[in-house]
A protein has these predicted regions:
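Hydrophobic structural segments
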Residues: 3, 11-321
């Protein structure tokens, strides 16, 4: 289930009068009406198929949940990985799972509000890839965040390396499904997407902005140029890797989350000044991978049906002025 910001605001019973009118009828009908009116149709996932006796939900520890999630990923569990438990205990019982891109303070509070005590986050908790904290001990923001997690007893497990190593890459599959481009995915060359026919760069950008809910993006290129081959570099991909792929594949467009401006950006600019056709679109790290974590929530829910799994967007941190 996808929880947007409005789902976690106060006043959880905005249609109280309407529900009260229906409460005099069949008890089960009333419960279904309550669930669909207040929480949306996703609430029905937690209702029993027959009768009123709610079956006892199967209990899982954090470790058991993690083991289920990574079970079918090739090579898992990895010996060296950033996918570690960064908060909480492996032994604590899971009451609910939230998937997100960045485990921000807002996401933590929203998870607590819906009764979830495990956050599966794609990116780092403490502002560096390895989540090293020695250098942050004197930082008041770090201290506040750590204390908040302790108070709420929330476990945070990072789901980065394993999700990318899934076949297909979990982020890529979620992104391409969101764009309606998954039928064009090529397993033999997963980073190169070829559309059925060329489209203008403008039409592709408009399509991405709508489906990824991106208000603004940065672009090196000509909006009128035709594009058919797209190199996928969601998130943050090493510039040398992108430049090497550009040399070999000569894609019409590089679609990336973020990149150092003096590297890939300048290589694309100089290439265009020479007469090359490759354009570059920079979506932002969070927004370029968020649909992949929304997909992760659906994927994990199928594997762990007894525990509610929700997606909460961490959101774009930038204000465009």
């Amino acid at each position: 289930m996808n929880l947007n910001r409005d789902d976690t605001k106060e006043n959880p019973f905005p249609m109280k009068k309407e529900i009260e009118k229906k409460s005099s009828g069949n008890r089960r009908e009333f419960m279904i009406q309550l669930g669909t009116t207040v929480l949306g149709t996703g609430f029905l996932w937690s209702l029993p198929k027959m009768g009123l006796a709610f079956p006892k939900r199967k209990e899982l520890t954090v470790k058991e949940a993690i083991d289920i999630i990574i079970k079918d990923i090739p090579g898992a569990p990895f010996e060296r990985t950033v996918d570690q438990l960064r908060s909480g205990s492996m032994d604590q019982k899971v009451t609910g799972i939230v998937c997100t891109m960045f485990p921000t303070l807002t996401v933590i509070e929203q998870a607590k509000k819906i009764g979830a005590n495990m956050i599966v986050a794609h990116e780092t908790l403490y502002y560096n890839h390895q989540d090293e904290t020695d250098w942050l001990e004197g930082d008041e923001v770090f201290q506040y965040k750590r204390k908040l997690l302790e108070e709420h007893q929330i476990a945070i497990w990072r789901f980065h390396d394993h999700w990318h190593r899934r076949k297909p890459d979990g982020i890529a599959e979620g992104n391409l499904k969101k764009l309606g481009w998954y039928p064009y995915y090529n397993a033999s060359n997963p980073r190169l997407l070829t559309l059925p026919e060329a489209q203008s760069l403008k039409s592709i950008m408009d399509h991405i902005k709508v489906h990824f809910d991106i208000p603004k993006l940065r672009l090196v290129g000509d909006l009128d140029q035709p594009c058919q081959s797209i190199y996928l570099a969601f998130g943050a991909i090493d510039s040398r890797m992108i430049i090497a792929a550009t040399q070999e594949l000569e894609p019409d467009l590089i679609l990336c989350g973020e990149t150092r401006e003096w590297e890939t950006v300048e290589r694309v600019r100089d290439g265009r000044l020479m007469g090359k056709n490759t354009a570059l679109a920079i979506l932002g790290h969070e927004l370029s991978e968020a649909p992949g974590m929304e997909f992760a929530a659906e994927w994990i829910q199928e594997k762990i049906p007894d525990i509610p799994v929700n997606y909460i967007a961490s959101g774009d941190p930038f204000l465009f002025y």
